[in-house]
Amino acid sequence: MQLTTQALMVQGTTSDAGKSVLVTGLCRVLVRKGIKVAPFKSQNMALNSAVTKDGGEIGRAQAVQAQAACIEPTVHMNPVLLKPNTDVGAQIIVQGKAIADMDAIGYNGYKKVVMGPIMESFGILQDEYQTVIIEGAGSPAEINLRENDVANMGFAEKADVPVIIIADIDRGGVFAHLYGTLALLSESEQARVIGFVINRFRGDIKLLESGLDWLEEKTGKPVLGVLPYLHGLMLEAEDAINVQQVEAADEQLNVVVPVLTRVSNHTDFDPLRMHPQVNLQFVGKGQPIPPTDLIIIPGTKSVRSDLAFLREQGWDKQIERHLRLGGKVMGICGGYQMLGESIADPDGIEGDAGESQGLGYLQTSTILAPEKQLKQTVGTLQLPEQPAVPVRGYEIHAGITSGIQTNAPVQLQDGPDGQLGIDNQVFGTYLHGIFEQTEACNAILSWAGLEATQTPDFDLIREQGIDRVADTLEEYMKLDKLWPEWADKFAK
C-alpha cells in the first residue's frame, strides 16, 4: 500500500480495542506539529451523541476527537449514526439528520445508499484539511457483516486509504487477534494494512519482544507501537458506561443513576464520576435503589418502554419513598419527561402508539413528535437557595413538553427550560452536558445537599486526558513510519 499523508484509518480487532482513543491522540499529535487534521468515522452505532453548531447529530467520540484536533465538530465527521431503539432496530441519522427507523436487515440493504453521503462527507473533509484520521467500527473481520460494509475495509477500499490495526493486550490473546484478523481479510485488504498497534500493555516490554518478532515475521507487517495501560484516563466512553471513579474525599454526596434499557448520553455523568466529593452508583436491572441523596433519571432513546421498565424494577416506589424521606430527584431529557404527568406517542415514534402515565412529580405533559429538537444552547440556572449561574449544553429530544413555566429553573437564550416540583425536591431539564460547567455542577450538588462543593474543571480534565494520550503516542509509537513525508516533524 502506497503511504499517503492525506488519510489514515484505524481499525481494531474488537470493539473497545482503543480505536477512538488512538484517533483522538493522533489528532492532537498532528495539531501539535502544525498539521491541519480532522477526525472521521463513516458509521457509528452509539446512544451517546453530540450536537453540532448547525443542529446536526454525530457520535460523541467524534466531537471529542474534533476537540483534540482543535476544530469545531461537523456532521461530516460522522455521516452515519445508528441509534438503537430496539434489540433489532435503530434510528438512522445521515449527515446529522434522522431519516428513518430500520431493522438490521433493512439497513443492510440500505448501506449501498448511504455510501454516497459517506463519500461526500469524506471528500469535504479531505478538501478542507491536510489529513483525515479515520476510525473504523468493531472489527473488519466480522464475516457476517462484510457484505456492503461501509465502516471498515469496505470504506478503506472505496476511499483507497492505508490502515493500521489496534488490539487490546489486556484482554489476552493479542497475537491471535492480530494474526487472525489479518488472515480473514482479502489479499487487497491485507495489502492495505501497514502495521499493528498493541494497546494497554502492562509490564516489561522485554517479555513481549519474542512475540512481536514472531508477529512481524509471520505477517510481514511492522508493530508500530506498544502503548502502555493509561490508568485513570478520563475520556468519554463511546458506548459502555464507564464506572471508574476518582479517589473520594471525606465529605461525599451519594448519587444513584438507574440504568434504563436504552439509556442515552450517559456521558452526562462523567463529571460526577470524576468529582472527588461524589459517590456515583449505577443501578441495573434487578437491583434496588440504595439509600442516597440524589437520584438522577437519565435520558433514553425509548422513553415510554423505559418508563415501563423502571416500574417493573420497582424503582418508581423506591423513588417515592426516597422523596418522602427528603431526598432529591433530577431527570435529564427522557428522565425529565418521565417525571411529568403523561407521555403521549400518537404517531408511534418510539414503538406502539399510545399514552403512558408519568411519575407525576412535575406538572408537565409530553407529546412525542417526528421532528427532533437538536441544538446547542446557553443560559442561566437558578435552583432554590442557590445563586443564578451560567449554564451551557445541548438538547436532543423528539418530545415537546408543556406545563407551568413560572418556576422553570433554567432560562435559555430561546426561552425557559425544565421545572421544579414536590417542595423543590424534583428538578427536570432537557439540557445534556449540564454538569460540565463548574458553577452549574456546584449549584446542583449544593441543592442536593453537598456543602462546600469543590467541583473540578471538567474541560481542563478532558484536555489533560487528550494531551496525556498524545504524549504517550509521541513516546511509544513510530509516528514517522505512518507519515514518511512528515518524518522530520516526528524526529525524537
UniProtKB/Swiss-Prot annotation:
One of its GO terms (molecular function) is ABC-type vitamin B12 transporter activity. The lineage of its organism: Bacteria, Pseudomonadati, Pseudomonadota, Gammaproteobacteria, Vibrionales. Catalyzes amidations at positions B, D, E, and G on adenosylcobyrinic A,C-diamide. NH(2) groups are provided by glutamine, and one molecule of ATP is hydrogenolyzed for each amidation. Pfam families: CbiA (PF01656), GATase_3 (PF07685). This is Cobyric acid synthase. Pathway: Cofactor biosynthesis; adenosylcobalamin biosynthesis. Coiled coil: none annotated. It comes from Photobacterium profundum (strain SS9). Belongs to the CobB/CobQ family. CobQ subfamily. Disulfide bonds: none annotated. Keywords: Cobalamin biosynthesis, Glutamine amidotransferase. The active site is at 333 (nucleophile), 432. InterPro entries: Class_I_gatase-like, CobQ/CobB/MinD/ParA_Nub-bd_dom, CobQ_GATase1, CobQ_N, CobQ_synth, GATase_3, P-loop_NTPase. NCBIfam families: cobQ, PRK00784.1. The gene is cobQ. PANTHER family: COBYRIC ACID SYNTHASE, DETHIOBIOTIN SYNTHETASE. One of its GO terms (biological process) is cobalamin biosynthetic process.
